């Protein structure tokens, strides 16, 4: 079990590591050769030019202005200087609201920490319960926790009052933040520039028709049922094979660029390659000619495949993007049932074109339920099997367990410095390593489930990651760690005493989570700003592949916030903070340092680095709110169970009302604010349409929407325009009959539609 000395060693290691990362970043960002790595967002916006083009030869690679090194930490105040409205214009609402999650943590935990250290720590410290318990492993730092309060003590009333303070304050902050972000979302949508998704809905599960193709059926259906507002449609094609060919060609082009650059450095020698297995065997040929030939052949295949996709009705997917003349028409269509059969002609608000995950649009809609069931089972087993490495991590936090497993290492382990390193630093870094591959696995699972937008993929992945963190990192660490630390106590006492030992031991797991917070939340966040991996990859690409300025821009990897991994990780800190605030407040300062440091670092990254792939207008906030509420309820239930083992019979029943009040609060927020994040108000749509009609009376909306939702691999294809030509019915008139290939079918008792 980690002692105060071990925590001090871990803090020293992580503080020095974080400081080293900041120093390295401050120096690297000043070098002209790294400018595109640390400021890619400004290059993508066209607001920054390369400093390599100016100055002497040495100044193209190294910053020779020594005065700039004196101000090497000025990036911190610069990151905080940009006001929030300007930041929304610069980076989008998603990025700004993501930053507000860190502010939410500071708003919740700073007042709680002040109260806890003023009231709770003296109450816990001024006891000697742990000293009187036999066969119990503890350290001095555990005397600051509720474990040091004797069984049946009246001091538990203080912890009860603290639980009420935590609950009411957290709910108050959550409600104000929910209200503010809902207002920000409505204001953002009202002031946003015209975008294709504002006029478009995605229609799925289009029923097959023997007389008409999907394209003809879509046009006919919406001309008949939305005659006044329907404008045009974009068919959805299964172009996955074409995408694979395009990706393959891009890889071949990279190899061609590499060998052409190599040849340009040494024109007297043509580069050669072997065309056998892995380039190690086979005939030796001219590399440039070889790749030119392969690219030409693949280009012909791409052209043929594109023609096949565009001309074959089998490539059409039973889905379409349908656009309307006004936002009002799109709102009505997306929020109403289109057919008597509620399983057909399903409509939803279309994601913006950047947000679409095209590979999943080709999946049959009927498969989605089966796919999600399969993934649910797979996720259960993934969570179960990951308990093994989590249990292994807990053995690292227990010196006695390591010494029993490998007794020959006991002399080395007992060295004070080594012991402090193992207990204070190694468990946190080991857990971090085991979790590295998890986000990639969860993203693959989310893609298999069939979500059609990147934002929904990230939200589902975040949901899975959160559940995994809660079960394995939080619960499993507590249970396994308690069992390993108090194994001797379990074996030498009666069964009736075991719940008491568990009740005492759970608060004592705070030391393990402190080490994890320092590794992940301190050094990990500092490592994010260094961008070591993108730095190396950029320079490798710049040396081997880049020939033009366009190539250099493509070599930049600005990255994104990474909501699917970042938000669940933040939620783990909310759980830890709320659970341990009333039982072991020593955890709170470490969490506050994380929230403050992460806010500054990620604000800098959002301003200078990250380039979001999509904009959802903070649609993820209901998930954030719900998970904080779950963390609050978990903290109440655990405190309830903890006090029951402490025989606090008079105070424990008063905790039962807290989960009920918290659930009621969540239901209120869900009914009051969540609809704003799910639907778009008709009133706002009409206002925006009216203003646009007054400002731009001659707007040609069809031209604006014509190729907005064409698949990226053939978005510029001219022959798609023919499918977009639609006659506009005259306003305020009875719609003309729409031509159709369908035969006459009179409705009678024998032809009634069946519902499946």
UniProtKB/Swiss-Prot annotation:
Residues 746-756 have a biased composition (Polar residues). The keyword Cell inner membrane does not apply. Residues 731-756 are annotated as: Disordered. The keyword Transport applies. It is a multi-pass membrane protein. One of its GO terms (molecular function) is calcium-activated cation channel activity. Keywords: Calcium, Ion channel, Ion transport, Membrane, Transmembrane, Transmembrane helix, Transport. It is found in: Membrane. Its main location: membrane. One of its GO terms (cellular component) is membrane. It holds the Pfam family PHM7_cyt. It comes from the Eukaryota. The chain crosses the membrane at residues 7-27, 101-121, 154-174, 373-393, 425-445, 465-485, 510-530, 574-594, 628-648, 651-671. InterPro entries: Csc1-like (IPR045122), CSC1/OSCA1-like_7TM (IPR003864), CSC1/OSCA1-like_cyt (IPR027815), Csc1/OSCA1-like_N (IPR032880). Acts as an osmosensitive calcium-permeable cation channel. Belongs to the CSC1 (TC 1.A.17) family. This is Hyperosmolality-gated Ca2+ permeable channel 1.5. It comes from Arabidopsis thaliana. The lineage of its organism: Eukaryota, Viridiplantae, Streptophyta, Embryophyta, Tracheophyta.
């Amino acid at each position: 079990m980690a002692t105060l000395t071990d925590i001090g060693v871990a803090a020293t290691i992580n503080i020095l590591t974080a400081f080293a990362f900041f120093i390295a970043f401050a120096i690297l960002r000043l070098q002209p050769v790294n400018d595109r790595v640390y400021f890619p967002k400004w290059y993508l916006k066209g607001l920054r030019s390369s400093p390599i083009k100016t100055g002497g030869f040495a100044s193209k690679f190294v910053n020779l202005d020594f005065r700039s090194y004196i101000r090497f930490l000025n990036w911190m105040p610069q990151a905080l200087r940009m006001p929030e409205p300007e930041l929304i214009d610069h980076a989008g609402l998603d990025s700004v609201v993501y930053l507000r999650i860190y502010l939410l943590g500071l708003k919740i935990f700073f007042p709680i920490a002040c109260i806890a250290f003023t009231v709770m720590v003296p109450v816990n410290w001024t006891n000697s319960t742990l000293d009187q318990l036999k066969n119990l492993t503890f350290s001095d730092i555990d005397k600051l926790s509720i474990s040091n309060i004797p069984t049946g003590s009246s001091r538990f009333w203080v912890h009860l009052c603290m639980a009420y303070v935590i609950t009411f304050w957290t709910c108050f902050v959550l409600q104000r933040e929910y209200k503010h972000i809902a207002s920000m979302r409505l204001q953002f949508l009202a002031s946003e520039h015209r975008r294709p998704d504002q006029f478009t809905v995605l229609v799925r599960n289009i029923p097959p028709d023997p007389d008409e193709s999907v394209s003809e059926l879509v046009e006919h259906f919406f001309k008949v049922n939305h005659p006044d507002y329907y404008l045009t449609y974009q068919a959805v094609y299964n172009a996955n094979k074409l995408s694979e060919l395009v990706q393959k060609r891009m890889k071949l082009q990279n190899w061609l660029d590499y060998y052409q650059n190599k040849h340009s450095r040494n024109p007297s020698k043509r580069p050669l390659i072997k065309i056998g297995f892995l380039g190690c065997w086979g005939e030796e040929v001219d590399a440039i000619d070889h790749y030119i030939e392969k690219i030409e052949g693949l280009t012909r295949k791409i052209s043929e495949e594109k023609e096949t996709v565009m001309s074959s009705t089998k490539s059409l997917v039973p889905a379409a993007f349908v656009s309307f003349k006004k936002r009002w028409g799109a709102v009505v269509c997306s929020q109403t049932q289109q057919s008597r059969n509620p399983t057909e002609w399903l409509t939803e608000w279309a994601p913006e074109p950047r947000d679409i995950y095209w590979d999943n649009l080709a999946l049959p809609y009927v498969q989605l339920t089966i796919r999600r069931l399969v993934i649910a089972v797979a996720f259960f087993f993934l969570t179960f099997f990951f308990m093994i490495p989590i249990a292994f991590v807990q053995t690292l936090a227990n010196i006695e367990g390591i010494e029993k497993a490998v007794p020959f290492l006991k002399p080395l382990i007992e060295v004070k410095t080594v012991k402090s390193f193992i207990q204070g630093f190694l468990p946190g870094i080991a857990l971090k390593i085991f979790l590295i591959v998890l986000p990639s696995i969860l993203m693959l699972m989310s893609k298999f489930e069939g979500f059609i937008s990147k934002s929904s993929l990230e939200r589902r992945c975040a949901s899975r990651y959160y559940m995994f963190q809660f079960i394995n990192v939080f619960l499993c660490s507590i249970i396994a760690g308690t069992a390993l630390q108090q194994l001797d106590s379990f074996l030498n006492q009666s069964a009736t005493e075991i719940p008491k030992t568990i009740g005492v031991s759970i608060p004592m797991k705070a030391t393990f989570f402190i080490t994890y917070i320092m590794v992940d939340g301190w050094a990990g966040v500092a490592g994010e700003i260094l961008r070591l991996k993108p730095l190396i990859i950029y320079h490798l690409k710049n040396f081997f592949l880049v020939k033009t300025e366009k190539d250099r821009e493509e070599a930049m990897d600005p990255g994104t916030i990474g909501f699917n991994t970042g938000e669940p990780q933040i939620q783990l800190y909310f759980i830890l903070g709320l659970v341990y605030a009333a039982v072991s407040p020593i955890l709170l300062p470490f969490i506050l340092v994380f929230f403050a440091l992460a806010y500054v670092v990620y604000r800098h990254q959002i301003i200078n680095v990250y380039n979001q792939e999509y904009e959802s207008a903070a649609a993820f906030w209901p998930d954030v709110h719900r998970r904080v509420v779950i963390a609050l309820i978990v903290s109440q239930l655990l405190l309830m169970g903890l006090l029951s083992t402490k025989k606090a019979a008079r105070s424990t029943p008063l905790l039962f009302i807290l989960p009920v009040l918290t659930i009621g609060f969540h239901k209120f927020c869900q009914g009051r604010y969540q609809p704003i994040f799910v639907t778009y108000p008709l009133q706002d749509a009409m206002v925006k349409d009216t203003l646009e009609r007054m400002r731009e009376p001659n707007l040609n909306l069809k031209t604006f929407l014509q190729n907005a939702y064409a698949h990226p691999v053939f978005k510029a294809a001219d022959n798609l325009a023919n499918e977009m030509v639609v006659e506009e019915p005259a306003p305020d008139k009875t719609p003309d009959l729409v031509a159709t290939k369908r035969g006459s079918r009179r409705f009678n008792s024998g032809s009634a539609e069946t519902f499946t």
